[in-house]
Amino acid sequence: MHERFHYKTLLEVKEKCRELSVDLPFAENTSALAAALDIKGFHIPNRLGIAPMEGADSTKEGKPSEYTERRYVREAIGGSGIIWYEAISLVEEGRSSQTQLLINEENLDAFKRMNEKVKEAGVKANGYEPLLIMQSNHSGRYSNPGNRPHPLIAQRNAYLETFRSADDSCIVSDDYL
């Protein structure tokens, strides 16, 4: 049964778990999650993070759209110390779809502006900038630039080809890699 997460207290969550006969451990003291952390020159204001999830809402050129920006601004307002951006393609032919984000020379300023907005939202709402991480991506055999399958592979793999076919013409050069 699916339902929205509407619980306001830990007690409500525990009661629901009992109702469903789900045995989960719960920590009464979660203060460690609020502790800052410094790792190799990066300051993380707390131990909370947003996992990457593709919105598939870029512009045709791969720039962050208003929907992309709004999603990440909202995540910054939520207070997580780390926001891990969704898969961002590094080359046009490596995009999983026409709506996957693409970072290149032409789009770089749009990403810079989005980063500034996200950081500003974090500072305004919580007093700190979240650490932003980019998940760089090449979709390989699942590439669909222009929303048409165009697999690119380093080598043949019989097992993977049962899911998405790719013949020798799809093999990229060592220079491409």
Per-range role (PLM):
Residues D38-I44, V73-E75:
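Short secondary-structure boundary/capping segments within folded domains
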Residues A56-I77, Q100-E120, N126, N144-G146, ...:
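Glycine-rich anion/phosphate-binding loops
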Residues F42-A51, G81-A87:
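N-terminal glycine-rich anion-binding loops that anchor highly charged ligand groups
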Residues I82-D109, S136-R148:
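Glycine-rich, proline-tolerant flexible connector loops at the mouths of alpha/beta enzymes
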Residues G55, G81, I88-E93, R156-E161:
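Short connector loops/turns at beta-strand edges and beta->alpha or beta->beta junctions
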Residues M1-K40, G55-K63:
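An N-cap/entry alpha-helix motif that binds or orients negatively charged groups
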Residues I50, E75, G79, M134:
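Conserved, mostly hydrophobic/aromatic
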Residues E129-L131, N137-L177:
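Non-globular sequence segments
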